[in-house]
Design a protein with these regions (language model features):
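Short catalytic/metal-binding and nucleic-acid-binding patches
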Residues: 1-236
C-alpha cells in the first residue's frame, strides 16, 4: 500500500490522491458493515442499543491507539450505528504506515473477536440475526474518509457524530421531510428543495442574510432576534 492509499473500485478512488495518509491530520472515517447489514445493534427511539458485535466494535475503536506503532492516533469521538460507524480521529505525528494499515488491522481484530460470538442477543432482549458458522468480515472492504482542514470543522463533526442516532430516528419517523423535491416553484422561480415544503407557503416569512463582516456581538444579536421571531411563528 502506498502513502497515497489509492483504493480503487470500478475506477473510483476513495482516498485523496494528493494526500500522504501517514502525515498528521484530522480525519472523519466512515465504515459500513458488510452488505450494510444491521449487525451492530438497533435504533430504539433516539438511542442505539448495541448488539454483542456492536460492543466488540466499540471496544476495538478505543483500542486503536494501543496497536503497534499507533500511539500517534487519538480517537476524538465515535458512534456505532446498526450498519456503520463514524470515527473522528487525529494523527498527531507521522506514522510508520499509512492510516489504511491501521484500519485494516482494526477490521481484522473486529472479525476475529466477533467470530467467537454465536448469536448472542441484543442487551434489551431483541431479536438478532447474528448467528454465524464461520469467520466473515464485519465491515466492507472500503472505508470513506473526510479530511478536516478548516477551523471549526472538528467541533462541527463532533456534533454530527453525536447527533447521528437522532437524525436517523427523524428520517424514519418523517421520511417525507428528507426527500428531495424537483422543480418546486415559488413565483417565477423554480428550484430543488428538501424539507417541509408547506413552510414555504407560511404567511409569516423572513429572509435571513448574514455578512462575513459582522462581528461576533452582531452575530449573537442576530441569532437571538431570529430565535425570538421563530418562537413566535416566523419562518426563515
Amino acid at each position: 500500500m502506498t502513502n497515497k492509499e489509492q483504493n480503487s473500485k470500478n475506477g473510483h478512488t476513495y482516498r485523496a490522491t494528493w494526500k500522504d495518509y501517514s502525515e498528521p491530520t484530522i480525519y472523519l472515517l466512515t465504515m459500513n458493515t458488510e452488505d450494510r447489514e444491521p449487525l451492530l445493534g438497533e435504533l430504539v427511539e433516539e438511542r442505539i442499543v448495541l448488539s454483542a458485535y456492536g460492543k466488540v466494535v466499540s471496544e476495538e475503536i478505543k483500542r486503536i491507539p494501543t496497536y503497534k506503532d499507533a500511539s500517534a492516533i487519538q480517537i476524538y469521538r465515535y458512534i456505532v450505528m446498526p450498519n456503520h460507524i463514524h470515527v473522528l480521529l487525529r494523527v498527531h505525528k507521522k506514522l510508520p504506515h499509512p492510516l489504511g494499515y491501521y484500519i485494516s488491522w482494526f477490521k481484522l481484530q473486529c472479525m476475529e473477536r466477533c467470530s467467537a460470538i454465536d448469536g448472542i442477543p441484543l442487551e434489551d432482549g431483541g431479536n438478532t440475526r447474528l448467528n454465524r458458522t464461520q469467520k466473515r468480515p464485519i465491515f466492507g472492504k472500503e472505508y470513506h474518509d473526510r479530511i478536516l482542514m478548516h477551523q471549526g470543522q472538528l467541533a462541527h463533526m463532533a456534533r454530527y457524530i453525536q447527533d447521528n442516532p437522532r437524525r436517523v430516528a427523524m428520517k424514519r419517523a418523517r421520511p417525507d421531510l428528507f426527500r428531495i423535491r424537483q422543480n418546486i416553484r415559488f413565483g417565477h422561480m423554480s428550484c430543488v428543495a428538501m424539507g417541509n415544503i408547506f413552510l414555504a407557503e407560511y404567511p409569516q416569512r423572513e429572509v435571513l442574510q448574514c455578512s462575513r463582516r459582522l462581528t461576533q456581538t452582531e452575530i449573537d444579536a442576530k441569532r437571538e432576534e431570529c430565535l425570538y421571531q421563530a418562537a413566535n411563528g416566523v419562518v426563515y
